[in-house]
A protein has these predicted regions:
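N-terminal Rossmann-like NAD(P)+-binding domain of SDR-like oxidoreductases, especially those catalyzing
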Residues: 1-185, 229, 235, 239, ...
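C-terminal substrate-binding subdomain of Rossmann-fold SDR/epimerase-dehydratase oxidoreductases
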Residues: 19, 25, 32-33, 40, ...
Length: 349
C-alpha cells in the first residue's frame, strides 16, 4: 500500500511538531516547510528528524511567496496539506498588522491557489487552522460552528479571511478544503510569550530562585484550554471524513488565567495568597512578598474576555474527544519547564 504524503506549513511550531509525530506513527511520509531565518528555530522537531530521516523532510518556503508554495506542491504532490503556519501571537498582531495579514490571510489564499493550479485538485485534501479568536467579542456562549464571528485583533480578522476563503474555494472549485476552529491548546512546546507557558516557566523560575516576580495582564480572562497533542489528532480526523466540513475543536470547559496560575503554583508547592481587587490584585508568597502582579502593558487594545467552545459536532462526527485535563496539562508543562531549567543550570556550571 502506497504511503500517504503530508505537507505541513508551520512544521517548527507547537502544532506542527506534534502533528508530524502523529502522522509518522501512522506511516505517513511527512514534508515540512520552514522559513529561512537567522536562527535555526528547529528545536521542536530536531528529535523527529534524527529518528525518522527517511520519512521526514524539511523544505524552505514562505507563505507570502506564492512561487515557493506552487513549487513545493508540484514537487511533493501531497495527499494532505495542513496550514498551521501563522503569526499567531494576538498582542503582536496589533504591532505588526500588515505582516500578520500577509501571513495569516494571504498565505492561506496562496496555498488554495497553489492547489487549484497544480492539477492535483481532486487528489489534495486541505486543512486550514482557524482560531477561537475569530469569535472575539462573543455573540453567544458557548461558541459553535454557526456562531457569528466578531474578531477583536488583526490576528482574528486575518483568520476570518482565511476561514471564508477556504469555504469559498471548497464551494467554487469542489476542493476538499476544511477549517478547524481550534480553541486554546497548550503544551510544553508552547512559545514562552504565550500566557500558559509564561506562567509555568515564570513560576518554575521563582521556585528555583531564578526569578523574583511574574508579571501578567488580564488574569480574569477566561479560556477553553486543551492539549495540543489531542488537538492535532482532530486536525487529522477532519481530513479523513468523506465530505469536507468545518469543526470547532475544544474541550467544552472554561477556566480563568488566575485559575491556571493557582494550579501551577499548587503543582510547584508554592503557597500564594491573593490580595486586592481588579487590576491591583497581587499574589503574595509565604514571606508576604509579591510574586505575581498585573501590568496594563500586557493588556490588549481590545480585550477578549471569554471564549468557550462547544465540540459537539466533532464528538459526534469525528468521534473525537480531548484526553488531557487542565490539571494534567499544567502538571506536564511544569515538570518539563523544571527539567529544562535544571538542565540549563547544569550547563552553566
Amino acid at each position: 500500500m502506497k504511503k500517504k504524503i503530508a505537507l505541513i506549513f508551520g512544521i517548527t511550531g507547537q502544532d506542527g511538531s506534534y502533528l508530524a509525530e502523529f502522522l509518522l506513527k501512522k506511516k505517513y511520509e511527512v514534508h515540512g516547510v520552514k522559513r529561512k531565518s537567522s536562527s535555526l528555530n528547529t528545536e521542536r522537531i530536531d528529535h523527529i528528524y534524527e529518528k525518522d530521516k527517511s520519512l521526514f523532510h524539511l523544505h524552505y518556503g514562505d507563505l507570502t511567496d506564492a512561487i515557493s508554495i506552487n513549487r513545493l506542491i508540484n514537487f511533493i504532490k501531497p495527499d494532505e496539506i495542513y496550514n498551521l503556519a501563522a503569526q499567531s501571537h494576538v498582542a503582536v498582531s496589533f504591532i505588526i498588522p500588515n505582516y500578520t495579514a500577509n501571513v495569516d490571510a494571504i498565505g492561506c489564499l496562496n496555498i488554495l491557489e497553489g492547489i487549484k493550479s497544480s492539477g492535483l485538485l481532486k487528489k489534495i485534501k486541505y486543512y486550514q487552522a482557524g482560531t477561537s479568536e475569530m469569535f472575539g467579542k462573543v455573540t453567544e456562549i458557548p461558541q459553535t460552528e454557526r456562531t457569528s464571528f466578531y474578531p477583536r485583533s488583526p490576528y482574528g480578522v486575518s483568520k476570518v479571511f482565511s476561514h471564508w476563503m477556504t469555504i469559498n474555494y471548497r464551494e467554487s472549485y469542489k476542493m476538499f478544503a476544511c477549517n478547524g476552529i481550534l480553541f486554546n491548546h497548550e503544551s510544553p512546546r508552547r512559545g514562552e510569550t504565550f500566557v500558559t507557558r509564561k506562567i509555568t516557566l515564570g513560576l518554575a523560575k521563582i521556585k528555583l530562585g531564578m526569578q523574583k516576580k511574574l508579571v501578567l495582564g488580564n488574569i480574569y480572562a477566561k479560556r477553553d484550554w486543551g492539549h495540543a497533542k489531542d488537538f492535532v489528532e482532530a486536525q487529522w480526523l477532519i481530513l479523513q471524513q468523506k465530505k469536507p466540513d468545518d469543526y470547532v475543536i475544544a474541550t467544552g470547559k472554561q477556566y480563568s488565567v488566575k485559575y491556571f496560575v493557582n494550579l501551577v503554583a499548587k503543582e510547584l508547592k508554592i503557597k500564594i495568597k491573593w490580595k486586592g481587587k481588579g487590576f491591583n490584585e497581587k499574589a503574595y508568597n509565604e514571606n508576604n512578598r509579591v510574586i505575581i502582579e498585573c501590568n496594563k502593558k500586557y493588556f490588549r487594545p481590545s480585550e477578549v474576555d471569554s471564549l468557550l467552545g462547544n465540540p459537539y459536532k466533532a464528538r459526534k462526527l469525528l468521534k473525537w474527544k480531548p484526553k488531557t485535563s487542565i490539571n494534567e496539562l499544567a502538571k506536564e508543562m511544569v515538570q518539563e519547564d523544571l527539567k529544562i531549567l535544571s538542565a540549563n543550570d547544569k550547563k552553566k556550571r
